[in-house]
Amino acid sequence: MTSVEELRACALLQDCADQLSVLGNIIRPGAETQQRTELHLKTAQLMAGSSLSNFSGELKSQKHFKIQQTLLASDNLAKVQKDRQFVSDVINALLEELQKKNNFQSLFSAVAEERKKKAELLDIINREEEGRRQIKKLQKQLLDIRKEKTEECERLEEEVAILKDQVQDMRVRTNQQGKFVKSCAEQLVYQESKHNSYKENELEDEVKMLQEKIEEEKNVHFETEAFLKQQHANLKQKLQYWIHRYEKDMEEKEQEITALQNKRNSSQTRIQDLSKKCKDMENVVIEDRIEKEHLRAQMEKEQREKNAATKIQAWWRGTLVRKGPRSKKADKSKKKDGKKGKKKRK
């Protein structure tokens, strides 16, 4: 970059920095903001150099229109101030680097940093999607666990009902058997006592044997009933345990879902903020590119005008050089003709 181009670029950047500084001073919350904005913008325009006024006129009008629209809302003042400060820092760093090193490396660094922030934003979005998939997976697991526990509870209830029915059937069967055996024994004793007396002892032994069997059946019945009651108590205890465990698992899963939802909401808020910042940075880069394009066009125009002026000056000098001897000869011939005319008159 030549020294003239460097000076022009520095002047343009200084003009932008001054305007941003003035813009930062005029951003005030309250009823006077809208009235002061136009006055400060006019002051910033008067501070710019006359040589760059035509080039930056369109850009100033666009900024003036955007600022008038944005500053009317009090909620956007902080955001505008932050964006203005970022643009001012980028322009000041670029101006300082241009003056010292005659390059635009800081601008490239700012663009690279914004790209890095955009990559981080995409990473956050990917993590958010992974969190959503994890939530869906946990919800599916919770539904499966709930279904499994419900089926197990129903199965245990069916087993308890079956055991109750078995106990009742055994109790009825035992009572019927006892009554039947007793009636049979009495009938046999009565018949045997009538028909044959010598069989009395045998029948008594048989009655005793039957009574022992009845007692044994009763003992078996009592033991079976106690065993079934114990099994019923154990199953009931297991049922209470599984119900408690089911409620505990449900509470833990709900806490995990709540934590994931809170994390998702926080990530969404951060993503929205980063999206706004990314859009603002893209607008800043676009405006900077437009400024560079305008500066390049202005420099090409000035170079063409300079070349044209040089050609015109060279052509004019050549014309003067060619016409110089001819004008001297014409003056001498005019003088001779004047002398001859005077002699004839005499």
Swiss-Prot record:
Keywords: Calmodulin-binding, Cell projection, Cilium, Cytoplasm, Cytoskeleton, Differentiation, Flagellum. One of its GO terms (cellular component) is cytoskeleton. Residues 299-346 are annotated as: Disordered. Disruption phenotype: Morpholino knockdown of the protein leads to a severe reduction in the size of the caudal hematopoietic tissue at 72 hpf, a strong reduction in the number of myb-positive hematopoietic stem cells, and results in impaired definitive hematopoiesis. Contrary to wild-type, the expression of monocyte, macrophage and lymphoblast markers is strongly reduced. Likewise, hemoglobin levels are strongly reduced, suggesting impaired erythropoiesis. Changing Q313A: Loss of calmodulin binding. GO terms for biological process: cilium organization; definitive hemopoiesis; sperm axoneme assembly. Detected in adult testis, and at lower levels in brain, kidney and ovary. Residues 299-308 have a biased composition (Basic and acidic residues). Component of the nexin-dynein regulatory complex (N-DRC). Interacts (via IQ domain) with calmodulin when calcium levels are low. Does not interact with calmodulin in the presence of Ca(2+). Interacts with hsp70 and may form a complex with camk4 and hsp70. Component of the nexin-dynein regulatory complex (N-DRC), a key regulator of ciliary/flagellar motility which maintains the alignment and integrity of the distal axoneme and regulates microtubule sliding in motile axonemes. Binds calmodulin when cellular Ca(2+) levels are low and thereby contributes to the regulation of calcium and calmodulin-dependent protein kinase IV (camk4) activity; contributes to the regulation of camk4 signaling cascades. Plays a role in the regulation of definitive hematopoiesis via its effects on camk4. This is Dynein regulatory complex protein 9. The lineage of its organism: Eukaryota, Metazoa, Chordata, Craniata, Vertebrata. The gene is iqcg.
